[in-house]
UniProtKB/Swiss-Prot annotation:
The keyword Manganese does not apply. IleRS has two distinct active sites: one for aminoacylation and one for editing. The misactivated valine is translocated from the active site to the editing site, which sterically excludes the correctly activated isoleucine. The single editing site contains two valyl binding pockets, one specific for each substrate (Val-AMP or Val-tRNA(Ile)). Catalyzes the attachment of isoleucine to tRNA(Ile). As IleRS can inadvertently accommodate and process structurally similar amino acids such as valine, to avoid such errors it has two additional distinct tRNA(Ile)-dependent editing activities. One activity is designated as 'pretransfer' editing and involves the hydrolysis of activated Val-AMP. The other activity is designated 'posttransfer' editing and involves deacylation of mischarged Val-tRNA(Ile). This is Isoleucine--tRNA ligase. Gene3D superfamilies: 1.10.730.20, HUPs, Valyl/Leucyl/Isoleucyl-tRNA synthetase, editing domain. It is an enzyme of class 6 (ligase). It catalyses: tRNA(Ile) + L-isoleucine + ATP = L-isoleucyl-tRNA(Ile) + AMP + diphosphate. It comes from Blochmanniella floridana. It is found in: Cytoplasm. L-isoleucyl-5'-AMP binds at E573. It comes from the Bacteria. Zn(2+) binds at C916, C919, C936, C939.
Length: 953
């Protein structure tokens, strides 16, 4: 039997079926690095419109985690698609270099090397700087392995001398505009940080347990209280009941606050003759708490009537006043709040309103009670004091009414995961209400595009409720707050802004250590004057470091390409950065420039496992990005990021990665089919003009164009999961289940140089030129690999290109236009249902074994006959007859048929033809030529002559 394989145009390509990504990606990275790909792109795009995505700097500490990978990959996708869209989109990665976490790691390393080493602050800063350098190199290597293109040779570091100097200059602008002040306020305090924290460094633990207690304070003016409640008989020992979850603050109590507009009741507990004052709305809740069933209401008054009365502290030897405050709520407690000005912002404001005398703090910076607290508490840590305080309450005439564990949300240190306290200390702040800053921030929010929209409301609520920003930290490794204050008045030196610039110039040359080395007279040249001032040694909140980079880094790097009003196009970070980098950047920008630093803010969710748990060491569910890369390749990780809806938490697991691998395989195999079938195609010689192309090929290019429009639109909207969805649908349905199936006969069996075959190759060429660009931002390594297999002259890298612009629309004036193709595809789907049913029934094994009769209305018959004898190729069957639906009685038809509709009925029967060994069609028109036995006449014509002519399929 003759072998006709050599007469076929069988697909061939050296593009591998298997990606082998973990190995091939390393080689590609070596080439990118050798060629300096990032610089090639910059030179090519230099004259284009600038698009700036500013990198929120990750902390230079530890290996990268999955959250880092998600963030960097999303940024890289955007940078690359913006390049394809005709922008100059540079990417300057950055690192946050100062702060406590670095200090802690360096301390551990020093102790590990030499337990007895004693180093000074300067040496410690040097250790920190060297540690950060090493950490950056580790993280940089991992980010590059993910396929992230950027200015890795010159990233921005908040510890670069010039950046440190510029951050100090930004602080100078804050000071110059009047927002900077020193205040004694309660601030979040971490005992392990030994420092104040800003709101952005606080996270809330919803599963924190505290001792909740109801405590009685005896009224001193019993006569007055009897009159206020209009009690006829004289009552003694009336108590005000407060409820608190911070027992340790009771020794610091200085007042009890009540709401002026709430009703308060004097109630008598009948079984023990106790007289208590509680908010009327909370009496029942209180009685349930103490399991009291019998009480009597003796009277009620507005809270305002109780103002300025006094009560006796239950175990400290002093009286405290009743004061009015509208911050009290009626959702829990008793409607009376104990006021400890040292340990709460609202308490502090009340103390200022009522001009309380300043008292020395009762606790030190480590959380231990001082001698001025209580003799039983001195030297005890506040978190270990509950039992003693409860005992003091029991022994003080039974002033404790209720004591129980209470679960509630409580502030924790973002780094140490331990409870925080409010502690009144002297700190430096940004005044949120100076020059209407808070109102300006709220107005500015409306001018920013928030993605998702919920970002706007998140920022709005935080700004409304935000206290003044505490800028100062009591740390060693940080950018100094380089100011001088008068030793007596603590007022800033009048030349502070001049000094700031002088210090910045020195820091730019010598680094931050210079501030600690300087003497007063080095800056304040008048020696006598310098004696009256002291240098401040506090360091800046690290959120000021990173939050000022729009001014200290971007303005410096892109000044030549920027207009007078600098607004960065996009900030992109995790949802936790609304209270962090997004917020600090906004406050600084509005304070110094009057407008937002960014035009758009995009946030992404966290990574979670398939059970909905966040990644954590304790759960043992952490997946390192480099483990995924080493097993599957970076493109699989990138595809997972792109295919996930990052606006929510992103699920990752072995099953999820398996599904992503299947998606990748489908895309790769589709492109491999394209490459394999244009291996003998030279676009310089073989490209067919659109008006000469086969109709189906025109449809394919038209459809590719419509898909490309959707893909680009979804890239622009940052909806990358939709991009993947469109690509997958294109590969699996429009191409895989239709176009590529139909054109196989034409590609394989027609004359190699026939117009019909070259037409199809032209379509495949245009489509792959489009597809390689579609996937390049996401599957960067694979796109780079594909690029070198596409025929024709081209630039070295797809990343220097723009979206493919040689696709075209169908001429809608021609008969076989878009509407006609929709009509045909509807017919084809109905025929395929019948074919599949008969295959399941065992009548046929494949569609080419089928002869199909279409019974249709005259209108449909006329439309189908446009395709003439090519209809069978479009349906991938051996033969098709189109008959009138009115000319047949279906009861007389023995073959199975599908009652599709009143317009169309499909009848299928197994072909009685002979199978052609070359094209596999079944036909009665077999060759009688002795040189070409067992093949059909059509195949002989295609082998020996010019071949058949195709207009439609």
């Amino acid at each position: 039997m003759a072998d006709y394989k050599s007469t076929l145009n069988l697909p061939y390509t050296q593009f591998p079926m298997r990606g082998n990504l973990p190995i091939i990606e390393i080689k590609i990275l070596e080439r990118w690095n050798r060629d300096n790909l990032y610089e090639i792109i910059r030179r090519k795009k230099n004259e284009k419109k600038l698009f700036l995505l500013h990198d929120g700097p990750p902390y230079a500490n530890g290996f990268i985690h999955l959250g880092h990978a998600v963030n960097k990959i999303l940024k890289d996708i955007i940078i690359k698609f913006k390049g394809l869209s005709g922008y100059d989109a540079p990417y300057i990665p950055g690192w946050d270099c100062h702060g406590l976490p670095i200090e802690l790691q360096v301390e551990k390393l020093i102790k590990k090397v030499n337990m007895d080493i004693d180093i000074n602050s300067q040496e410690f800063r040097n250790y920190c700087r060297e540690y950060v350098k090493k950490q950056i190199e580790i993280q940089k290597k991992d980010f590059i392995r993910l396929g992230i293109l950027g200015e890795w040779k010159n990233p921005y570091l908040t510890m670069d001398y010039k950046t440190e100097a510029n951050i100090i200059r930004t602080l100078g602008k804050i000071i110059s505009n009047g927002y900077f002040y020193k205040g004694i306020k309660p601030v979040y305090w971490c005992f392990q940080c030994h420092s104040a924290l800003a709101n952005s460094e606080v996270e809330y633990n919803d599963y924190h347990y505290s001792n909740a207690v109801d405590v009685g304070f005896s009224i001193v003016e019993n006569v007055s209280i009897n009159k206020i409640f209009n009690i006829n008989c004289y009552i003694e020992n009336i108590e005000l009941v407060i409820w608190t979850t911070t027992i340790w603050t009771l020794p610091a109590n200085q007042a009890i606050s009540i709401h002026p507009d709430y009703i308060y009741q004097l109630v008598k507990i009948l079984d023990n003759e106790k007289y208590l004052i509680i908010a009327a709305n909370l009496v029942n809740m209180f009685m349930n708490r103490i399991k009291c069933t019998m009480w009597q209401v003796l009277g009620e008054v507005l809270g305002s009537k109780l103002d300025r009365l006094t009560a006796r502290h239950p175990f400290m030897n002093f009286n405290v006043p009743l004061v009015l405050s509208k911050h009290i709520k009626l959702d829990s407690g008793t409607g009376l709040v104990h006021i400890a000005p040292d340990h709460g912002p609202d308490d502090y404001l009340i103390s200022k309103k009522y001009k309380f005398k300043n008292r020395d703090s009762l606790i030190d910076s480590n959380g231990y009670y001082l001698s001025n607290s209580h003799n039983r508490l001195c030297g005890l840590h506040i978190f270990n004091a509950n039992e003693i305080i409860i005992d003091l309450l029991y022994k003080s005439k039974n002033f404790l009414y209720f004591n129980a564990n209470y679960q509630h949300s409580y502030p924790y240190c973002w780094r140490h995961k331990i409870p925080l306290i409010f502690r009144t200390t002297s700190q430096w702040f940004v005044n949120m209400d100076h020059n209407n800053l808070r109102d300006k921030l709220l107005r500015t929010l409306q001018q920013v595009r928030w993605i998702p929209d919920s970002g706007y409301s998140s920022m709005q609520s935080m700004i409304v409720n935000r206290p003044d920003w505490c800028l100062s930290r009591q740390r060693v490794w940080g950018i100094p707050i380089p100011v001088f204050v008068h030793k007596k008045t603590e007022v800033l030196h009048p030349n502070t802004c001049i000094f700031i610039e002088q210090v910045a110039q020195l820091v730019e040359k010598y680094g931050i250590q210079i501030w600690w080395d300087l003497k007063n007279e080095d800056i304040i040249l008048n020696k006598a004057e310098s004696m009256n001032y002291q240098k401040i040694y506090d360091t800046l909140d690290v959120w000021f470091d990173s939050g000022s980079t729009h001014d200290s880094v971007i303005l410096d790097r892109f000044n030549s390409k920027l207009k007078s009003k600098l607004q960065i196009d996009l900030y992109l970070e995790g949802v936790d950065q609304y209270r962090g980098w997004f917020m600090s950047s906004l406050i600084i920008a509005v304070a110094i420039k009057g407008y937002a630093p960014y035009k758009q803010v995009l946030s992404h969710g966290f990574t979670i496992d398939d059970k909905g748990n966040k990644m954590s060491k304790s759960l043992g569910n952490i997946i390192r990005p480099l483990d995924i890369v080493n097993k599957f390749g970076s493109d699989i990780l990138r595809l997972w990021v792109a295919s996930s809806d990052y606006s929510k938490d992103m699920v990752i697991s072995d099953d999820v990665l398996k599904n992503v691998t299947d998606i990748y395989r489908r895309i790769r195999n589709t492109i491999r089919f394209f490459l394999a079938n244009i291996n003998d195609f030279d676009p310089e010689k073989d490209l067919v003009q659109s008006n000469r192309m086969v109709a189906l090929d025109q449809w394919a290019i038209n459809h590719t164009l419509s898909v490309q429009v959707k893909i680009i639109s979804n890239y622009e909207q940052y909806k990358f999961h939709n991009v993947i969805r469109y690509i997958m649908k294109f590969c699996s349905i429009e191409m895989g289940s239709f176009y590529l199936d139909v054109v196989k006969d034409r590609l394989y069996t027609l004359n190699k140089d026939s117009l019909a075959r070259r037409s199809c190759q032209t379509a495949l060429y245009h489509i792959i030129e489009s597809m390689v660009r579609w996937i390049a931002p996401i599957l960067s390594f694979t796109a780079d690999e594909i690029w070198k297999y596409i025929p024709g002259n081209r630039s070295k890298y797809v990343f220097t290109e723009e979206w493919y612009d040689r696709l075209f629309k169908i001429d809608e004036n021609q008969i076989v236009n878009s509407n006609y193709w929709n009509f045909f595809l509807n017919i084809r789907n109905k025929v395929n249902k019948v074919i599949e049913q008969e295959r399941v029934n065992g009548i046929i094994k494949g569609s080419l074994e089928a002869d199909v009769i279409l019974y249709v209305t005259p209108i449909l018959k006329k439309k189908l006959r446009i395709l003439k004898n090519e209809l069978a190729f479009g349906l991938i069957v051996s033969s098709v007859m189109v008959l009138s639906i009115d000319d047949v009685d279906f009861n007389t038809i023995k073959e199975n048929h599908e009652e599709n509709s009143d317009e169309l009925k499909v009848v299928l029967k197994k072909s009685h033809g002979i199978k052609c060994l070359r094209c596999w069609n079944y036909t009665l028109s077999m060759s009688k030529n002795e040189n070409y036995l067992n093949i059909c006449s059509r195949c002989v014509h295609n082998i020996t002559g010019l071949g058949e002519d195709r207009r439609f399929f």
